[in-house]
Amino acid sequence: MRQSSGIQRVTMQDIARETGYSVNTVSHALRNKDDIARETRERIQKVAREMGYMGNAIASSLRSGRTRTLAVILGNMSNPFYGIMADTIQDAAAMRDYSLLFMCSRDRADLEEQMVEAAVARRVDGILLFPTNESLRTIERLNALGIPFVLMSRALGEDVADSVTSDEEQGAYLAVSHLIHNGRRNLAYLSNLRIVYSYEKRLEGFNRACDEAGIPREDRHTYIHFDPTREDAPVLSWHASITNRLLRWREEGVDGLFVFCDEEAWHVQSVLQQTPLLQDWDVGIVSFDNIQGVQHFPADLCSVECDFAEMARQAIDLLRDRIHGDERPPQNVVCPVRLVCRGSCKPRN
């Protein structure tokens, strides 16, 4: 089989001669088109790799007016959730022949706006955005520029923009129902306000489970704390704030905690282990994301599992539809969740 010399570029015509297929079939196979049988695609792609074929992205872009590149603007990368989402988005994009440009806003509106401008300057076809509470201005800017985009993991309202999220209300309901099933009836919801919409959806699920179990309002507690992942957040103040709140809840007889996400639940478990007055507290903990189900995580958490791969597939497909002219009203895709039980929530002693 003829190899690429490093001087003479391998063309689709070369691959067609080598495989016996038409240039059109080779073209479709190399672009992973579904109209070509999988076995044929795989054979052509294997031959192309062996011959050293490299597609001409610039020429393709000039012909189509598109770059087949998407920008992904992530939040704060200290949270392992974003690494998992980045992996699954990469897989979904590759299956649809898109390249990705990853950026990080650190959950800051000013950086988010800078990232959007940088993505637009690089002529991306569309943007997957993990928004902040202040993203409405970014959304207005994207709409004004005519750049297709989808909000990932977080919504800002049902009619604001396309979004793909997990079922946050149902997830919170499952989490709190599990606490109640284990005999815990004095319950607390510990959250941040990174996204008000997410906080409120999970609060709805928290209250639905409590209502069904007949738990009175005086036995339901909520606390919104500092965000420890923000660069401008005073870590010591956050630690002290959480410690004081947990000490207070113990005095009030709280025996079950629903925590907004795994990252925060791990911080809570650290406080419980490091604070002598809290070390023997019989409190169940359930959180959200199930990071432990995907990668190593330093906590044995009972957690609501999001279908990361399905969220990524839905987001890429929705964005692709918009790129190709889909003009439907904003679509809000909600992916199912399930509860994964571990040692952080056991029957009450």
Regions found by a protein language model. Give the residues of each.
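Short, solvent-exposed amphipathic alpha-helices that sit
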Residues: 43, 80-95, 171-174, 197-220, ...
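Short beta-strand segments enriched in small/hydrophobic residues
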Residues: 18, 23-28, 62-78, 178, ...
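N-terminal helix-turn-helix DNA-binding module of bacterial transcription factors
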Residues: 1-66, 346-349
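Short beta-strand elements in bilobed, periplasmic/extracellular small-molecule ligand-binding domains
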Residues: 93-105, 207-238
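Hydrophobic alpha-helical segments within soluble ligand-binding/sensing domains
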Residues: 164-189, 201-208, 235-247, 265, ...
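Flexible loop/turn connectors
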Residues: 239, 243-349
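Alpha-helical recognition/docking segments in bacterial nutrient-uptake
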Residues: 1-11, 65-177, 181, 195, ...
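An alpha-beta-alpha
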Residues: 175-215, 331-346
